[in-house]
Structures are given as structure tokens and as C-alpha cells.
Regions:
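Generic start-of-chain signal for non-secretory N-termini
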Residues: 1-14, 18
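Short beta-strand scaffold segments in enzyme catalytic cores
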Residues: 24-28, 149-152
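N-terminal Rossmann-fold NAD(P) dinucleotide-binding loop
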Residues: 80
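Conserved small/polar residues in nucleotide/adenosyl-binding loops
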Residues: 153-159
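Metallo-beta-lactamase
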Residues: 100-148
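Divalent metal-coordination and catalytic microenvironments
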Residues: 12, 38, 75-76, 143
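Pre-active-site segment of Zn-dependent metallo-hydrolases
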Residues: 18-23, 30-73, 85-93, 97, ...
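Beta-strand-turn-beta hairpins that frame and shape the catalytic cleft
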Residues: 5-10, 32-33, 128-136
């Protein structure tokens, strides 16, 4: 599963959340596999009149949809999950999260009439998920919201 091809490189692609508060979303790409961590929104600046919320530009994911394997969500704050109902309209792949985080996500999906349209998998701490060439482990961490996780990613790329 985690076999390395010559000249292959792990790409880390921030799609939001840099130099700003909110809109956390990062893609990890290796060969023909892409996994995405978090899918948050941000709130508009004062000069953005008429705008209620800001979602990340996921054009890259839409253009590579056949390679996107899933979303891994670290915790239930809006800046990490708020864009899920909007993004999954175009990039509908499975979501992996801990129990409380998934409960919050399911509430959002229900509000948008999407609950039955999205595959979801509740993950326990210490559990490994294998998707494409990636292996992801959920690790318990402390945060200002319960059931947060840090993620350990393993790919064929050298460390």
C-alpha cells in the first residue's frame, strides 16, 4: 500500500487558513491520492458588506476530484468544519472525524438537507484509516472543544 515510486514527492497544499483566522483546509497529495484536512470557513471583514461567511476556494480539489479520497476533520470549530456543507456539494467524498465532531458535522449537514448524501465514518483515537497511499491515525489532544484530535499522516514519501 505505501510503496514509493521514483521521483514522487509529497505535496502539501494549503487551500485556506494561512495569514488569516479561519478557513482552515489543507490538501496532502502524493501521486494519485489526495486527502484533505479540515474544511473551515471564516467570517467577513468589516468592509465585506452583504457577505455572511467566506468559504475556501476548492477549485484544485474539483479539478482533481478523481484523486480526492476523503476529508479528515480535527475538531468541531467553525473555522475547521463550517464550509463542509458548501464544499461537499462539489467534492462529495467521505468524512472521517471523532464522535462529537461528527455529531456537529451531521447537524450542519441536516440543516442543508445533505445528511443522507454524504458518507461519514466516526473514528476512535488510535484508529488508523488507509485511503489511497495514505495512512492516517487519530490521536487525542487537548483543545478548547471536546473530542479534538491531531492527525499522524503516513505516506510513501521519505521523512
Amino acid at each position: 500500500m505505501l510503496k514509493k515510486k521514483q521521483n514522487s514527492k509529497l505535496k502539501i497544499i494549503p487551500l485556506g487558513g494561512l495569514e488569516q483566522i479561519g478557513m482552515n483546509i489543507t490538501a496532502f497529495e502524493y501521486e494519485d491520492s489526495i486527502i484533505v484536512v479540515d474544511c473551515g470557513l471564516s467570517f467577513p471583514e468589516d468592509d465585506m458588506l452583504g457577505i455572511d461567511l467566506v468559504i475556501p476556494d476548492v477549485t484544485y480539489l474539483k479539478e482533481n476530484l478523481d484523486r480526492v479520497k476523503g476529508f479528515f476533520i480535527t475538531h468541531g470549530h467553525e473555522d475547521h468544519i463550517g464550509a463542509i456543507p458548501y464544499v461537499l456539494r462539489d467534492v462529495n467524498v467521505p468524512i472521517y472525524a471523532t464522535k462529537l465532531t461528527m455529531g456537529i458535522i451531521e447537524h450542519k449537514l441536516r440543516e442543508h438537507n445533505m445528511l443522507t448524501k454524504v458518507k461519514r465514518k466516526v473514528v476512535k483515537y488510535g484508529q488508523h484509516i488507509n485511503l489511497g497511499c495514505f495512512r492516517v491515525e487519530f490521536i487525542k489532544t487537548n483543545h478548547s472543544i471536546q473530542d479534538a484530535a491531531c492527525l499522524l499522516y503516513t505516506s510513501p514519501s521519505p521523512r
